[in-house]
Every structure is written in C-alpha cells, then in structure tokens.
Amino acid sequence: GWYMGTEIGVRDFCDYQRYNILEEVGRRMGLETHKLSSLWKDQALVTINVAVTYSFQKNKVIITDHHSAAESFMKHLETEFPPARRLPADWDWLVPPMSGSLTPIFHQEMVNYILSPFFYYQPDPWMTHVWRNGEMCLKKQQISFKAVARAALFSSTLMSRVLANRVRCTVLYATETGKSQTLAQRLNSMLNCAFNSRLLCMEDYNFSDMEQESLLVVVMSTFGNGGSPGNGESFKKQLFSLQYLRNKSRYCVFGLGSRMYPQFCAFAHAVDAKLEELGAERVTPTGEGDELNGQEEAFSAWALTALKDAYKEFKIQGQLSLQLPGAERFCEAWDPLRHRVAVESCPQDRITALSAIHSKAVLPMKLKSKHNLQSPQSSRSTILVELERERSPEVMDFAPGDHVGVFPGNLPQLVAGILKFLPQTPPTNQCLRLGYRSDTFRVMRKTGRLLDASQHSLCLRHSPTSWTLP
C-alpha cells in the first residue's frame, strides 16, 4: 500500500516518470554516477529508502518496510489457505520493487487468473447511465470507415511530401549487448526531427545503398580483440573490400567499448579510417564511450556536437533545440533562462570541491623535483616527477602501475597580478555554484559542480587544465 516504504522511496522518488531523484542523490553522496559497474544506483536507492522509513518513524507515522510486508504475506498464505487450495495472486504487484530475491515472496509461485462472476474496475457512470431526459444523453458521432481512410491517406500524403524534401540519413548500429542499439534509437529519434532518418542493423543494411547516402551515422561497439560484433561482420567485409565511392557522402562514427581492453573502440576507428580513405567526408570527429567512465555522458555530448555539425553542413536552420536527457549540462552557450550562478552558502575548500566533482580522493601535494631520464640527444622524453605531500589526514592508497591525475594550480603572485586588471572582481573567498534548468523538471537544479572558490580559484587556479594563460 501507500504506507510501505518502497512505494514512496522507490516508486515515487526514483521512478523516471515521477520525481526521479536517484542520480541527484547519488551525486550528493559522492558516488561514481558515470559508471554503472560501481552499483551507485543500488547504494543511492537503499539510502533513500532508509531516509523515508526514518522520517516516518521520527514523526510517529506508521509505515512498514518491504521485508516485513513480504514475510507477513507469506505467513498469511500458510495460515489462511490449505495446500490443496490456492487463490489467484499477481506476482508483479506483490513482489517489492527492491531487494528482489532477498524477500521470500520473490520465490513464491503464483497463478494469476480471474474467477467469474467478477467485478472489474468500475466504468465511467455517465457512459452506462440511462438518462430520463433523452436530450442529456451523450450522442456518439458516427464516422464512416471511408472518412477515416481518407483522413489517414491525406495525413500520410502530407508526411511523405515533408520527408521527401528532407535530407536522407541512415543510422547503423552493431551490438552484442544491445547498448549500441539503444543509443542508436535515441539518436535516430532526434535526427527524425530534421532529417529523413531510418534506423538499421548492419546485417540488415543493403550495401548497394551506400552510394546514395547523404548522411551515414554509425554507432557500434568493439567485440573481442578489436573486432566487430556478430551482426556487423557482413558490413565489415563489404566495407573493407570496397575500393572507392562514386558519391562522396558525409558520415560520423561513435564507438563504445571499455578501456579495460587494449583495443578500445578499435572497430569504430577502423570504420572511420576506411570511410575517410574511400573519400567520404567526416562531419564530426569520432566519439568514444567508455563503459567504465561516463559512457552516457560522452554519447550525449557527442550527439549534440554531431547534430550541430550536421545542421551546419546541410544548412538546416530554424530547427528545434534538440537535446538528449541530461544533455543541458553540456550546453556551451549561456542562457539566463536556463542557467544561473548562485553564492554557495556552505563553501568548500578546493580539495573537497575537486573530490566531489570527480568522485575520487584528491590529495594536496607540491612539486618537489622533476628530471628527464633520457639523454639530451634522445628523441624520447621520460620525466621523473617527485611530489611532496602536504599535511592531510587522508591515507594514500596506491599500487605500482596506477595512473595519477593532476589538477595544477597557479602561483598566488600570478593570480593576484591578473586579478587587478579585472573589473568588479568578487571577494577571493567567495564560492559560487552553477545551476541549470532541466527540460524535464521546470526548476533550477544544481550541477554538483562547485565553481571552486571564487574568481580567484575558478578562473586562475584551475584554468591551466583547460587553456594556457598568456
């Protein structure tokens, strides 16, 4: 019922069609929301449900958890019904929306059937009521099948004319797990708003259509040792056996893979190189999505860039602002109606802010020394960097071969020298936070990205990671 914790904590708060706060909670908890294998969804979900149960109990409102409800139902089955007699039960409705096989009801076999006579959901009374006054009753308008057929034909004719004037586009995908297909379907829906786009699997693609393509978009994963998925083998053989293209079409490629393997996105780069060799024109640089590091975010950013480049290439203007879910965070243009900067009430120091942004432990260090281990005559460069750790309660845990990420900072003297040339500079100890308004929720949401410490830190302390100061 309504007062079972999971109905509120899972369904109401975490369903995509409802409040959908799961990712926001995960970011505030400092979880790696860009990597599904970190199981951040499960951790955030449990935390939300614990908070819901605690808030009800704190205010002395009765609520039950899903484990207690499941055990209570199993006890009800044992005591009320003998073994030879069973009543209908709907497994989908009775099993809680979290914990799965940890609840005993998950393993209970059920049969869902209807015993007659049976009262279904009550129909609308005004549809079945017998009106005493005939003028008040609802009169159904009779529409002939011929009229419906004419309307459908007219609509399809108009749509065909609109699509005929659009640029043809084909979205191809090759996948083993279905991830590439999901992303390709999402991209195809966006392209259909401005192009005459179609979605095909590589094995279903008629390769003779390659000469007539205006825009070819390829979304694929890499399988095995840099090879193609099973449904992309035929396309790969035909493409790499091709010598030239008479029609120099445009194309763009997005590859999916995992950096755990040495041949990361090798198939995508091979297809990109072959199309370029055949003379096709690349619309946007090849994108890469790492399964272990923000694959969805990488695809969203690449898709927006590809759409903008395609619009510019084919001179398409006046189109709607198309975005993927959550892609408003990748928008480069400042929109006062969508973005705002607010003063952070609880300022964070620079190390804490960087740790929260990247969901990793960041330790303050100073550069002690650096030496080039190669000889001056060598064309190679191997630099030994020694870092001196500052005082910090954090324990440094590492293993040989680990990679190191560095967030360099500028000298305070350089920062102060540049700040004096900027008009109306805010206090150097002021923290700002960027907020954006989502298309799904018409409210300002925090990005989780603290504009660390003012103009002093934001513009000058962190700027070397993005560009070079004069």
From Swiss-Prot:
Q: What's in the keyword line of the UniProt record?
A: Calmodulin-binding, Cytoplasm, FAD, Flavoprotein, FMN, Heme, Iron, Metal-binding, NADP, Oxidoreductase
InterPro entries attached to this UniProt entry: CysJ-like_FAD-binding (IPR003097), Flavdoxin-like (IPR001094), Flavodoxin/NO_synth (IPR008254), Flavoprotein-like_sf (IPR029039), NADPH_Cyt_P450_Rdtase_alpha (IPR023173), NOS (IPR050607), NOS_dom_1 (IPR044943), NOS_dom_3 (IPR044944)
Region (Calmodulin-binding) residue ranges read 145-165
Q: Which cofactor does it need?
A: heme b; FAD; FMN; (6R)-L-erythro-5,6,7,8-tetrahydrobiopterin
- What reactions does this protein catalyze? 2 L-arginine + 3 NADPH + 4 O2 + H(+) = 2 L-citrulline + 2 nitric oxide + 3 NADP(+) + 4 H2O
How many cofactor units bind, and how?
A: Binds 1 FAD. Binds 1 FMN.
- Where located? Cytoplasm, Cytosol
Q: What does this gene product do? A: Produces nitric oxide (NO) which is a messenger molecule with diverse functions throughout the body. In macrophages, NO mediates tumoricidal and bactericidal actions. Also has nitrosylase activity and mediates cysteine S-nitrosylation of cytoplasmic target proteins such COX2.
**What is stated as this protein's family in its record?**
Belongs to the NOS family.
Q: What is this protein called?
A: Nitric oxide synthase, inducible
Name of the encoding gene:
nos2
